[in-house]
Amino acid sequence: IDQKNLEIASKGLEESGVPVLAERLDVADEKQWQHVAKKASERFRKVHMVVNNAGVGGDSVSVDNQEKKGWQWTLDVNLMGVVYGAKTIVPLIKGHGEGGWIVNVASMAGMGGFLHGGAYNATKAAVVALSESWAEELTSQNINVSVLCPAFVKTRIYDSERNRPKEYKSQISGSESSNSFRRKTKKMIDNGIEVSIVGKRVVEALSNGELYIFTHPNYRSEIQKRFKAIDDAFKDSEKSIALKESPDK
């Protein structure tokens, strides 16, 4: 999508001696995935890994102000982009029989949602669930799956509006309330960790065969609160009068 930065990244890798194939890709377009997969196979012969990294912030609004176009954009990029990536690349990995890896980039929001982030939260939770499912499905074929769940990282996701296609434009996109939220988000992201640190953490985690990859251990206590609430809810169900007659309780 960002041709200029794609060229900069490609040049940097080539100068360090890394073979590169730089292709623009709209991850929400399955046909473009197929095109890139074909080009990658021709360039490298064998493909061993796909990193589903593309993501957008989407609209940040209350539940009663959400619009279909905003939801659709977030779903198509954050969720269907991951689905198309795996659907397209897994057959290539299976084809050579040497095993490989799927790395899906979710978010801490996939472990516990934040206020007014309905569409974003939903897609990231879905990516976590997909990763868990695929990890179990593909392990027998020596294909590993990991899901990266970072908190704030110094990226431009707060400015993903710049890449929103016109067919996904909503009344909310570009509004003052939306811009205000982006400005607040930018401040938090600017104080996040460097992308290079995340990259090193991912390499470390893959070497260890980790399914869940976390980059912000200070969020552990917040996630523990959620899982404690879930555990407490199970305890409540054990005391349920309504469930006493259920054979599956």
What are these regions (language model features)?
Residues 112, 133-143:
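Active-site-adjacent segment of SDR/Rossmann-fold oxidoreductases
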